[in-house]
Amino acid sequence: MVYTLFQVHTLKFNRKDYDTLSLFYLNRGYYNELSFRVLERCHEKASARPNDSSTMRTFTDFVSGAPIVRSLQKSTIRKYGYNLAPYMFLLLHVDELSIFSAYQASLPGEKKVDTERLKRDLCPRKPTEIKYFSQICNDMMNKKDRLGDILHIILRACALNFGAGPRGGAGDEEDRSITNEEPIIPSVDEHGLKVCKLRSPNTPRRLRKTLDAVKALLVSSCACTARDLDIFDDNNGVAMWKWIKILYHEVAQETALKDSYRITLVPSSDGVSVCGKLFNREYVRGFYFACKAQFDNLWEELNDCFYMPTVVDIASLILRNREVLFREPKRGIDEYLENDSFLQMIPVKYREIVLPKLRRDTNKMTAALKNKVTVAIDELTVPLMWMIHFAVGYPYRYPELQLLAFAGPQRNVYVDDTTRRIQLYTDYNKNGSSEPRLKTLDGLTSDYVFYFVTVLRQMQICALGNSYDAFNHDPWMDVVGFEDPDQVTNRDISRIVLYSYMFLNTAKGCLVEYATFRQYMRELPKNAPQKLNFREMRQGLIALGRHCVGSRFETDLYESATSELMANHSVQTGRNIYGVDSFSLTSVSGTTATLLQERASERWIQWLGLESDYHCSFSSTRNAEDVVAGEAASSDHHQKISRVTRKRPREPKSTNDILVAGQKLFGSSFEFRDLHQLRLCHEIYMADTPSVAVQAPPGYGKTELFHLPLIALASKGDVKYVSFLFVPYTVLLANCMIRLSRCGCLNVAPVRNFIEEGCDGVTDLYVGIYDDLASTNFTDRIAAWENIVECTFRTNNVKLGYLIVDEFHNFETEVYRQSQFGGITNLDFDAFEKAIFLSGTAPEAVADAALQRIGLTGLAKKSMDINELKRSEDLSRGLSSYPTRMFNLIKEKSEVPLGHVHKIWKKVESQPEEALKLLLALFEIEPESKAIVVASTTNEVEELACSWRKYFRVVWIHGKLGAAEKVSRTKEFVTDGSMRVLIGTKLVTEGIDIKQLMMVIMLDNRLNIIELIQGVGRLRDGGLCYLLSRKNSWAARNRKGELPPIKEGCITEQVREFYGLESKKGKKGQHVGCCGSRTDLSADTVELIERMDRLAEKQATASMSIVALPSSFQESNSSDRCRKYCSSDEDSDTCIHGSANASTNATTNSSTNATTTASTNVRTSATTTASINVRTSATTTESTNSSTNATTTASTNVRTSATTTASINVRTSATTTESTNSNTSATTTESTDSNTSATTTESTDSNTSATTTASTNSSTNATTTASTNSSTNATTTESTNASAKEDANKDGNAEDNRFHPVTDINKESYKRKGSQMVLLERKKLKAQFPNTSENMNVLQFLGFRSDEIKHLFLYGIDVYFCPEGVFTQYGLCKGCQKMFELCVCWAGQKVSYRRMAWEALAVERMLRNDEEYKEYLEDIEPYHGDPVGYLKYFSVKRGEIYSQIQRNYAWYLAITRRRETISVLDSTRGKQGSQVFRMSGRQIKELYYKVWSNLRESKTEVLQYFLNWDEKKCREEWEAKDDTVFVEALEKVGVFQRLRSMTSAGLQGPQYVKLQFSRHHRQLRSRYELSLGMHLRDQLALGVTPSKVPHWTAFLSMLIGLFCNKTFRQKLEYLLEQISEVWLLPHWLDLANVEVLAADNTRVPLYMLMVAVHKELDSDDVPDGRFDILLCRDSSREVGE
């Protein structure tokens, strides 16, 4: 409806307009920067106007109004500027675009826009002359002459989507969550041709943001020169402004409709559904307590070093102590006073008691320890933010939460003297004018907030010291208390911020960023199957307060309206929803308003129940002496927080519980598959049988046998049961988590969480793999279960439930893994209520042996019939000694499994080729189906994936991948409907449940019967299974200790033999779904077989090879799709142009009489395209050149029955094509180039004298073009049919057409016309960067010599070096990041502009420290999506950058080129300030080897240790054999996450540091590994016991940790005077490997000296080991100085 108001359909762009608009897309970064600078300058000048009383009404200030020129933060101006870029471009080209035709028809004498003057005034990087621009804006607002028409068109154009705007921040994530886009609106010119791709309209939310930006620009620009601002008056303003406000109001209303989330009430779970995602009380509590656990874990790290008072101690001693008064007026004051904090209300005697003391030597407080304190407190800030977010209930917007302050003029954190809870008075609003809201925290969260302010923040202040100066002045902070705010230093600002604001990132010098905050949202709660984003969570919290917590509307109208206002809904909400006329909290008295809000918070606190889980005394307090005594008594053990669990009434088990569970899971129509399934569920749930084994056929529903009992157990209120499920492989883990978490009936989490953190009290089922089951840590956790539960929950009603082992036959059949299962025998099985073992391939013999192998008694002597439900007579012996009851459903049903699958055994010449044929045929018949291919080796898996991905989307898995990668890929294949084929070894055959799976192909000649059954069993509802073997190569090789491979012959008979079923060999019914029998197959499977057979016959008749199948099957990944000139691609080794097959193309024209001529390049082995005309009787004869690999194409005249035969020139290896035109007597000329193996075809139309290369036959309305790429082994054929109004390129380009649905760029005449600007731009860039056809790098471009480049070379710089969002956009050309039709890459380009932009960014990083580089990234934000524009921006400073590098890195080049040698004796500061600089080379080496020996012995995580001296254990790191496992070990302990959040590594991409361990440093790695022998010789020479020096990955971890350790680097650069700062990791690694002269003039590597300095920092003495926390502003004493 809004788009009708904007009249979008009348905005028509013609061909010339498109040519002009291409300038904007080619230079978008430039126009982004231009618009930002113009708005910034206008706003700056407008804000400097004298005070103006003019106001305008807003939604929040409807009565008094808000100032017209609003105060905007720089970040807001930046985003507004980027949104304005397209419209600024329109204004600068108003004379060239046809949409401004009304303006262009101005009469003589009417005012015109001088676009040339505008460009001169505005286009400099920092525009200062904006007077003329301001006058134009005023004239447009006043509709002077026809200038109003310009603004009218620009406003209507706001409804068009000119492409993606800037990203980042909470609001942008919310935008991306809105999926209801408007339909595409076509734009047609006067010739009926769709010409412009700018037809996808803006969403209402984006349109509203665009109008916000336009309004801000109009107001600011007009205010620069206007005498007054009456034109913006609501009553007497100009008509244009009133029309803009009408537009804005309509858009705002539609935005509200669009943003209405699908929220439905779910009473059964005490929650709501938000966009299909369950959000309830358990979701909130799970998230909250996970954050609390993270806070406690970080507190434990501090407690290891200090005697930390607990949260309970501080709450009891101070917060709930009635001797401490917190009576003070609420709200901030205008002056910054020293006592404007509740800290000053705490008596001095309590301040001294709470001070933490060092556990270690009281005289040691090292720089390393201070750094550890700072980092840990920064990390626990984020979980505390989330705790507050959920505790207040009525949600905050993120900026509101971010600006919580406990002191200063913006203070909003108070302590209520009556309830002793924390109260938050906030008044944040988008317009900054909302009345304050009061929200009260519960007791538990209040204790944590109070503890953070009184203890942790003061620790952090002392650890940072008085010299801390990371914060700069920013508009969000109030700098008061200084006579001249402009003279305030960064140290002053940092001091104010630390003593005022709660949520800081002290490492970066900023408030906690949204990107850091939202990381928790992506991972928590761990048991939630679907995570909500921040906007959905906000709406969900409002809905919970409205439906689950809120009062009844009929009786508590004002109470309910208060709840809405506390969620920051506008005053219109009260009127529209509740019938209250303009209700607001100002409508009632101040006391009533406070009471209403306090009662709303109390309702939320009671509903959420956080205080009931936290044991603290509200009536009694502890004296100071008691706490002191407690500290002395707890010198070795800190006091734990006590929790109690609510006592719940006991509820007996009932057979109806299983039915109710099934209805919860599957709906009210749930029924059991058969009676066997019902009785087995009851046996597991009701009977006392301690151990049960079940064998059921694949696809029977074994998961439901334990899933339903688990749901029934979880519904009981008397006891909390915690169960465990284990599967054999990691690939099953993701599938199990997805299946068991559906509908939110169970709280599911990985077993690794239990092993690392213990039971969280929320999770019902932990899921893991066999390796977890066998781990010592899991065994220890189970052994100590009762003690842990008693200490943690203070109750015994949390018990171990079921131990479930799926596919347990692997314990016996997986011979190669049996050594890994040894730890299972140590598990205390008796601790579980019941053990359940499930398998589809475990006959009695296999089951019995498998159970005995893990330490159980085995099966009972007699199998139990399914109908027997006897209670056990004697269970006193325990589960481990009690025999397991076996339920064999296969024997009970007497049906051979897998009869529903059609099994085919084929012997073929080539297994991969035959498999590809089958897959392509399947996807032609069933395009949405999926398939699994089982290969025999890991190499074969990767080869198949590499060669098949050109045809369809492939996921491949094998055992060498890391666990996380396996889980990720499996989940992707199961959930992503576009993935077609899963290729893997036999580990993909067990337990995976995949919808749309219709085919399984097995290429492994050594599969045994179990692996065969498991693989075929993936076809749940029928399908096809092919066993492909090579002819004359099948050999049943019996591997030692394992089942023999399957034999050639009837598969069904082998299955019967395995299960012990009656043989039917030679009898009726022998073949079930095999050997051609289709009797037992479903109708759908039979139909699929018949369709496959018909397609095979059709292909055989047409004699089509596998590579000539219709290209509609050849589904390419979207990331591989690129246009003609996108030939340089650093992200992929292969580039397929025009979505065509790289090796062959086949085109059949069934509707037109077209002649297709293909052109073959002699340098490639290409196959030409044959054209078949079904409407004529003409015969096409193909002739083959015996001397080349090319196939000629014959051309047949449609209008005659003659046959045209192609001739072959054997001597020149050339192919000639003859073409005859029956309409004329002219014959085409054939031309052969004898010097090259090329085909030259010339066609002459008898009606004209012109000769064309791409021939066009006007009588057939067909155009045929042939394209040859001389640098690749590909032939690209593009065919366009002018008589059909559709895209003629149907060879896999459907998805491209979906992205650009209305741009027909294949129209040849239009293509040439529309690409003129692109060609011109391409030529300019090629001239500006002439060496991109070679292996050029940006240092060459800057002018460095080859010997300098050798040492400054930027290796390891790729797309992952760039931060997220910088040159990393998807769906665009990978070489230049532009739309494909505007691609400026050129054929033969080896180094793309995008790669050069990466390297240019790295060069800028070379010259800047962390803070300067962060500011630089903000400055170049207009170019984040435009690497070509950034290169232009970069090249302007080319000479300056070259000179700066020469100056800054002269010392580096001198050292790395060995022209200078570092000597420690030349460093005066080093000799005076460090003992290391007085050591001999021998002593430095001994210290180095000792450090590594200690790290190895204690299994300390290396990177973490050198980063901040934190001695975390990581055994897997030291046992890792390859880089992948090593990186996984680091991920498990959270090293990379900590690096990104707390160090400069956050300024690179998320994968950058991880990839340093894989491929980037091969040369340095080789050098280091060659030096290992020399290290051993040095150890022997030193007379020390030879110890293993670190392997490469550990050594690299050390250097990365030192590089990111800011404290260490500052110390090293201070002591070692010959070096300066380097900001790139490659330079740091090269520098660390140079040799230095020690005090005795012996040479040692610099990295050994680094380790010695690092060790010295860890043991530096400081005067006092106790934090001097004087809770006052004038404390000037810094600990350690």
UniProtKB/Swiss-Prot annotation:
Gene3D superfamilies: P-loop containing nucleotide triphosphate hydrolases
Matching InterPro entries: DEAD/DEAH_box_helicase_dom, Helicase_ATP-bd, Helicase_C-like, P-loop_NTPase, Y'_ATP-dependent_helicase
UniProt-listed GO biological process terms: telomere maintenance via recombination
A molecular-function term among this protein's GO annotations: ATP binding
Broad class of enzyme this protein falls into: isomerase
Gene Ontology, cellular component aspect: cytoplasm; nucleus
Helicase ATP-binding domain sequence ranges: 683-860
Induction and repression of expression: Induced in absence of telomerase TLC1.
Domain Helicase C-terminal: 917-1066
Highest taxon, organism lineage: Eukaryota
Bias kind Basic and acidic residues: ranges: 1284-1307
Region: Disordered, residue numbers: 1140-1307
Function as written in the Swiss-Prot or TrEMBL entry: Catalyzes DNA unwinding and is involved in telomerase-independent telomere maintenance.
Annotated family: Belongs to the helicase family. Yeast subtelomeric Y' repeat subfamily.
Name by which UniProt lists this protein: Y' element ATP-dependent helicase protein 1 copy 2
Species whose genome carries this gene: Saccharomyces cerevisiae (strain ATCC 204508 / S288c)
Top-level taxonomy: Eukaryota, Fungi, Dikarya, Ascomycota, Saccharomycotina
